[in-house]
Amino acid sequence: METLNGPAGGGAPDTKPQPAGQHHRHHHLHPLAERRRLHRAPSPARPFLKDLHTRPATATPSAGRAPTPAAPRSPSLAGKAPPSPGPPAAPGRLSRRSGVVPGAKDKPPPGAGARSAGGAKAVPGTRRAARAGPAEPLSRVGRPTGAEPPPAVAKGRKTKRGPGTPPARAVVPPARASRVPAVTLSVTSVAGCRINHTDSSSDLSDCASEPLSDEQRLLPAASSDAESGTGSSDREPIRGAPTPSSGSRGPPPGSPEPPILLAAPPVASACLGGRSSPGGASTGSPGPGSQEDVGGRAPPERTILGTSKEPSLGEQPRLLVVAEEEELLREMEELRSENDYLKDELDELRAEMEEMRDSYLEEDGYQLQELRRELDRANKNCRILQYRLRKAEQKSLKVAETGQVDGELIRSLEQDLKVAKDVSVRLHHELETVEEKRAKAEDDNETLRQQMIEVEVSRQALQNEVERLRESSLKRRGSREMYKEKKLVNQDDSADLKCQLQFVKEEASLMRKKMAKLGREKDELEQELQKYKSLYGDVDSPLPTGEAGGPPSTREAELKLRLKLVEEEASILGRKIVELEVENRGLKAEMEDIRVQHEREGTGRDHVPSTPTSPFGDSMESSTELRRHLQFVEEEAELLRRSISEIEDHNRQLTHELSKFKFEPHQESGWLGDGVSKGPAASVPLQEELKSARLQIDELSGKVLKLQCENRLLLSNAQRGDLAAHLGLRAPSPRDSDAESDAGKKESDGEEGRLPQPKREGPVGGESDSEDMFEKTSGFGSGKPSEASEPCPAELLRVREDTECLVTIKLEAQRLERTVERLISDTDGFIHDSGLRGNGLASPGVQGGGGEGNSPSEPHLLETINVRMKAFRKELQAFLEQMSRIVDGLSPLSHLTESSSFLSTVTSVSRDSPIGTLGKELGPDLQSKLREQLEWQLNQDRGDEREGLRLRATRELHRRADGDSGSHHGLGGQSCFNLEMEEDHLYALRWKELEMHSLALQNTLHKRTWSDEKNLLQQELRSLKQNIFLFYVKLRWLLKHWRQGKQMEEGGEDLEESEHPENVPGLAELGVQGVHQTDGIDQEDADQGCSLPMGEHAPHSLVQISEHGSRLQSSDGGPLNKQVVENQQLFRALKALLEDFRSELREDEHARLRLQQQYASDKAAWDVEWAVLKCRLEQLEEKTEKSLGELDSSAEGKGALKKEREVHQKLLADSHSLVMDLRWQIHHREKNWNREKVELLERLDSERQEWGRQKEELLWRVEQLQKEKSPRRSGSFLCSRREDDTRPYPHQGSLHSSRPVSMWPCEDADSIPFEDRPLSKLKESDRCSASENLYLDALSLDDDPGDPPPLRNCLAEEEESRKGNLQRAVSVSCMSEFQRLMDVSPFLPEKGLPSAGSKEDVTPPLSPDDLKYIEEFHSNDWDYASPRAEADRPPDPWADRTEMGRVGHEATTEPCPDPSWYLTTSVTMTTDTMTSPEHCQKQPLRTHVLTEQSGVHVLHSPPAIRRVDSIASGGEGRSRADPEGPFPMSRARGNLADAKGGHPEPVLNRWPCTPPRHPRDCVEGSLRPLDRPICPSLGFASPLNSLDMSKNMSDDMKEVAFSVRNAICAGPAEPHVRDMACQTNGSRTAGTQTIQTISVGLQTEALRASGVTSSPHKCLTPKAGGGTTPVSSPSRSLRSRQVAPAIEKVQAKFERTCCSPKYGSPKLQRKPLSKADQPNSRTSPGIPQKGFSESAWARSTTTRESPVHTTINDGLSSLFNIIDHSPIGVRAGSRSRSAEPRQELGPGQETGTSSRGRSPSPLGVGSETFREEGGESTPVRQDLSAPPGYTLTENVARILNKKLLEHALKEERKQASHGSSGLTSDSHTGEPVPAEPGSMEELPCSALAPSLEPCFSRPERPANRRLPSRWAPPSPTASQSQSPGHPMSMEEHGEEDPPEEKPHL
């Protein structure tokens, strides 16, 4: 080994120098190439090299293979470490370099080692050098075997070896040293030079690729070849002998080789070692191989010599003769040189490839850089835009806060817009240019493609030319040689030939060059094309990405090429088809001949007589008949197949549709169509329907499969028949046919039908019948030779088999028909169901309108499927009829074949019979006719499936009859059917068909007309129901107004009872009125309220119960029952209403009669009195005349007396008329009151009993509903029920009697899930009947849902006061609805109301805004309105402030809110502004501090405390102020009115015995005290109190409600208990008639419409003159202001903070009014400021421009209008209250109020910074923490506001305390503003009012904000009261202040 090492070492040095160049050369190539290759080792390239090396090595390995195992590990390891047994270091490198070499190394035995080294070297070289200059390594590797490589390889190896050699030597173990050293040397040198690079890379890359090398090693032969180089394999074969020996010697050769290496010059040995292992050494014996390798490695010559010598010394002497050796060596050298050349070429190619790749990579890199730059630019732009966006957001926030529009911002935005436009234009242009470039590039690409194609063509042409030239030259050469031999003399010719040859050679070289060039160009173009593909997508891709598909021209060209190909293919196929057809014809002819033969034989025999009717007499005819029949059968089968495929397609479609429906159940729910049934219960039937549909579809698919199976069976049977016909003698034996039919049956019956599919798959006459055919043929050939030979039996057999075949076909067709029938029936049923569902045809109770949207699509699909199925069925039937005709017509045979064979015989006969042809001819006609008829019929009515079934049955009967008749004819002995007979038969058939069709059509038409009529009937019924409902509503409205008129006269408030159409049980029951049920609470409240007064209360609960029940039923499929129930309820309600009308008319008549009598008696009395007086006068005159005598003075005295008398007479007449009037009124009222009282009491009793029963029933139903429906709905129903039950009780008692808190549904509102609350009501599907809801809502506006209608009836006064008030808000979703509402609205200006003071109460017609407010409040109030069992409820509900429940609790504490307080919150309405505990807490803090200051003790207590307080106060208020206070129904209104009324008692007195001067005031002022007023200070149970303000009301609403409540309660100034939930300022003005106005900042627009001030803006605008202008209308507000400055103050106060814009709506944060603005507003305090009641907040929320905007929410709920119909006094009071309470309070108090203002709510605490100083104080944004109802934006706004508020609050408080106090005191210094006599007469204007305004300083919308001054001259008080904070001032400045109140968000 040492020697080896030494020599190797020596060799290495020698070699090194030489290889160095090579090595370097390779190396240069190598670093990139090899590294890439190494990394790409796994790629084929490297394996290829390895394989080259490996092959030689492998070949070598005979010797080297033993080592190979070790080598393998070295490959991977060696690559990295010298693990290879060989030289540790070298092996590592070697193995690394040559993934395969390691094997060689390990293999190295003698030659293997060398070769392996060479291979290794070569491999590494190849990888490195070969990668770079693969040729060299390869040549080396290859040369190892050949001596050639030595020069190059030797150099390379030496070079490699040089560096690596020493380590190799040192490391290599002695045994392997020879090989390994060589390897090591070569490898090492390689490693040293190149491998170092490759090693590092190859270490990594090889690791991955080494497996390959290992694999190669594992394949030593291959690997040795590869290692030795490509040449090695060649060489190895040469050295085959040596190799084996070396192989055997392999391991030993290690020693031999070392000697060889030693003997050889060091170079040789080195070369040998290095070379031999890679090259021949390993391949061959160590000697030759090694020598060769060494030679290869060593300088070629030296290596060769040395090697040859050495090998001869070492091994050759033994193996080969020296000459042979030399020859071998020469060959090896040649091979090596060739390998080197090839390697060089490969290197060049590789280099070119690398260059190209590099160029592409560079281009990609440039593109990537460009893209990165673009990305950076885009990022930069994004950053800039983000920055701008942030800036803009900040600015917008700023604008929202300040309310000032940033002109600069607008300008900058405009500039940005211009820039953006420019940029977009520029980008557009750039895009166009880029597009142009792209198009150009595509064109270029196209041209290049064309060029490529041309080049390819030319290249092909050149190749062909070259080939031709080559061939010609060869020929010439041959001929020339012959010529020379023959004619040597002809030198000229030879010279010519030489010249030609030369030319040809030159041409060939030129062509080669051109070819090479073309090849390069082609490669370049291909690469470019690849690049384009990567960029633009594949040209072939069906959908080019972008324009990636390449230019259209290119695609055209490609498509043309493809088209050509396809056309060629088509032509080929066409030719094949033609050939096949020809062949087929030939076969048919042959078969025909055979059949004719058989038939002749058959006719020859006498079996024919046995079948007298058989047309076999003419065998040709019969065969043609059969053939025709078979053809017909095949056509039928084809039709069947097509139909089935269509059915399958449709089935798939249907499945798809169903799956769609499956995932869109809501659409399917449309099928039910009934909005009411749209709940969970409704979805249940839908789901069931879906399930059944899915099942049906599954069945359909199964049946389709069966159909397919049967169809295939039919086809196979037809084939069999065909075969039978063709083969003649043996049709499928009965056994076969039976088996098949059995199989078919099995398939069709069981769904294992798929098993026979293989048979079924074939087309008619396809291979599927091969088995049958085989059976038949085999049976025919072998089974029945005797029959074949015996003509008679054969003929009979044939006939029988034919008939059997026909019978089986018929059976299959019948089975198929049955399946189709089943399918059709199923589909029909499905269509019918879905149609019923979708079109409402089947479910009378269901309205189909909703469902039609979805159902049509699916039923339509099903119908199309059905139509096609029926058409298919028709075809089948026609086919079956033909079969039957054939079979029956041939039935004469039936007696011969009693069994199925009879039919088959008949069939076979029929085939031959003329009938067959006739049938065939007529069949299609019949078929088409039938099909048309069927389709027509189907089109007529797709749903008449049952009728179709009947038809089918009849048809079957007819067919049977026909068959019978046919068989009879046959039996008649007719040997053949006469054409006449057949025609008669067909005629009869057709006649029957026509009859059936006419029947079917009649049926269909009948069904159709019936369904149409039914639909029409249903529609008419619906319209009738709707009309009845409208009639009912209008009647109710009329009745209400009638009663209102009476009440106005009597001062009663009964009218309201009838004002809630909802209360009418019928309404809820009406299908129309589904909505309210969801709103169970509202509806129930309203319904009960109404129904009680009308005696319909019980019906209402019934209605709801029945409604629920009906819902259950409907879900259970009892729509009819539901409709019946609804209709019954409606008629019941109508009946009750008519009864009421009758009673009213009767009373009217009685009153009229009484009046007549009274008039007559009075007139008589007057006449008598007049006569008496006249007498006295005359007497007096006489006396005076006598006394005065002739005095002239007597004349004067007479004149004076006359005048005096006239005056007296006038006075007397006036007094008399007044007395009469009053007496009449008193009479009327007393009568009404007594009657109503009795009626109400009776009704209450009866209804209570009814309720007891209904309650049980309802509970049970609710339980059912809960089970079936969502808990939410059931919960609401339960609550409603509960409430319904309780509600009546309170009313039942005296007015004063407090009703159970839980009495009102609202009371339970808390218990009701939040969702079930009014919001849920609005949300519920019931909402669907919006129009009806509107009616109901509108009707209910005046009715207090909470108020028991009976009470209302009783309280005429209250009702009177209420008349004016729109108590309930209707959710108006659109103007049309609103208009409709207004038309029907009982709340429209009460034209019928007396113009008495009560008229003032009349609310002007509601504006949409008013409606909205009403709606908002209504929702809230409705829930809250009912005196919820809050008092009863534990305070815990308060824990849920966020929950409506909280509100509900508050509400419950209060008796039912007055209708005026129906704050309906639209769904959007914020639920609880105060609900969030934070608000409550915050408020309490502020309020507590300031409460005392305000002078109003505002206790911010937790809802529980509040509840208690309210209860207590309610109790006090009731007892104190309103004996009737207990009646919550009008409480809200009444209380407000009373409060405003100026009489604390009237205020509290809901039913003041004496109508308050302002009935409105009475109504509003007499807020019935809460059963237990929450706030004692509120001594009345203001509806607000009763309202669970926290419930659905937004904070603003709560505030408004609270303020209203306070105002209503405004008793002596009692500390207001501020309802935290309300977040209202509880400041109450304690004027003589001070209304406690609690400024309620409307957090949500909902409060806007609060009854009193509830509509913060216009809605609350008092009807100052009792005018009919909508409350919200500015005029009205101004008027009201004029009427009662005090009220204005109150309103202002109310508006003041309550409406703090902040809370009112985040948007509303008002900006401090400019001082100028504030003073203005202050100046016109006398004019009720819309703002007051509206609350600046609401105004701010409302559209600034709309006059009614106040009512319009900023977007929270455009529908949310609270219409305050409460008397203007009340409204004004509430409004002014918002302003006034502050007035009252004075600066300190005001501060208190403001502080009290719900901190979160707009109380104006901070937000309302009392801007009495002229609004200097910045509005304090109150806490924005929004109640749960708040929208996100509101929350954000609230948060922002909170912070701002807190900050502003501090300042505002300071200001409020200082400036605010001053301002307030100035403006409202408590100067009582004279109010209308009935209104609070002089509410001291407290500073509070001003501060209030600032809170809402956000300017009102200009329309709303008409300056009060505009409307009324501001009174000094008013101006005072109107502090900048006053809503009114705000209103005045609304235009001016907008900035202040701009929405924060």
From Swiss-Prot:
Protein name listed in UniProt: Microtubule cross-linking factor 1
Leader sequence residues: none
Protein's organism: Mus musculus
Biased composition (Polar residues): 610-622, 1717-1726, 1738-1752, 1857-1867
Residue ranges the record marks as coiled coil: 320-396, 424-712, 1120-1196, 1229-1270
Annotated positions of the Phosphotyrosine modification: Y1413
GO molecular function, one term: microtubule binding
GO cellular component, one term: extracellular space
Entry-linked InterPro entries: MTCL1-3, SOGA1/2-like_CC, SOGA_CC
Region annotation Necessary for self-assembly, microtubule bundling activity and apicobasal microtubule organization: where it falls in the sequence: 1-500
Function: Microtubule-associated factor involved in the late phase of epithelial polarization and microtubule dynamics regulation. Plays a role in the development and maintenance of non-centrosomal microtubule bundles at the lateral membrane in polarized epithelial cells. Required for faithful chromosome segregation during mitosis.
UniProt keyword annotation of Phosphoprotein present: yes
Ranges of compositional bias, category Low complexity: 55-81, 91-103, 167-183, 240-249, 273-290, 1672-1681
Sequence ranges of Pro residues compositional bias: 250-259
Keyword set, alphabetical order: Cell cycle, Cell division, Cell membrane, Coiled coil, Cytoplasm, Cytoskeleton, Membrane, Mitosis, Phosphoprotein
Residue stretches of biased makeup (Basic and acidic residues): 599-608, 733-762
Region Necessary for colocalization and binding with microtubules, annotated ranges: 1-241, 1672-1767
Residue positions where Phosphothreonine is found in the record: T613, T1403, T1661, T1669
